């Protein structure tokens, strides 16, 4: 576990990997579960905020992969599960160009690394959560997008989901657990979308 203010620092990420090795002797699974969104399209979003989105959402994944891949290769394999977002696949209700671009980048980074390391026994996949009901939705997003009206935000989000309800963190976790497990031994370079059908919907 690397705290949110350190995930963009190479030395801190390497120290995390080294600490895991010291404690457990090997690393079989890496889950990159980092994310934060900033509102705004290309005009509204500042260059500083754009850079922050790329660093926090994408560079963090790059650094963790960079430092763990040699360890996994040395030990004969492993599984990497990266977390992206449906914002990297489609419009999800608000302009957040930095977040969307960085999460799309996570998916493509995963595909490239998956192909490069497939013959070394290392699998790399992405879980793509949709609009879930998490504490962050009520604590932060409602203030950003619905003037603090939690019920209004939830109603808007549910309306986009064909399943008619929002999942939660357990749904994301179950997908990640599958991809990290031996049951997914022939699965690499792909995504599991956990969104109640939202991405498949065309309107």
Regions found by a protein language model. Name each.
Residues 1-3:
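Short, small-residue-biased leader/transition segments that mark boundaries at the very start
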Residues 41-54, 157:
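Substrate-binding pocket helix/loop in short-chain dehydrogenase/reductase
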Residues 65, 102, 110:
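Active-site helix of classical SDR
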Residues 70, 115-116, 185:
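Alpha-helical segment proximal to the catalytic Tyr-Lys
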Residues 85:
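Residue(s) in the substrate-gating loop at a strand-loop-helix junction
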Residues 90, 176-177, 188-203:
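Short C-terminal tail/terminal secondary-structure segment
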Residues 118, 123, 187-189:
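Short, small/polar-rich loop/turn modules that mediate ligand/substrate recognition or access, typified
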């Amino acid at each position: 576990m690397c705290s949110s203010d350190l995930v963009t620092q190479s030395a801190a990420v390497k120290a995390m990997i080294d600490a895991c090795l010291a404690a457990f002797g090997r690393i079989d699974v890496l889950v990159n579960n980092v994310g934060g969104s900033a509102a705004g399209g290309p005009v509204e979003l500042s260059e500083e905020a754009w850079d922050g989105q790329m660093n926090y959402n994408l560079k963090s994944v790059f650094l963790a992969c960079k430092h763990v891949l040699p360890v996994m290769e040395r030990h004969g394999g492993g599984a990497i599960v990266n977390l992206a977002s449906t914002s990297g696949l489609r419009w999800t209700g608000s302009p957040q160009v930095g977040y969307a671009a960085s999460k799309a980048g996570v998916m493509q980074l995963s595909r490239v690394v998956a192909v490069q390391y497939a013959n070394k026994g290392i699998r790399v996949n992405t879980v793509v959560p949709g609009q879930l009901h998490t504490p962050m939705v009520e604590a932060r997003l409602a203030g950003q997008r619905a003037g603090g009206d939690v019920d209004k935000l939830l109603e808007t989000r549910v309306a986009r989901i064909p399943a008619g309800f929002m999942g939660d963190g357990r749904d994301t976790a179950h997908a990640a657990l599958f991809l990290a497990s031996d049951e997914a031994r022939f699965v690499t370079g792909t995504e599991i979308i956990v969104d109640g059908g939202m991405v498949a919907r065309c309107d």
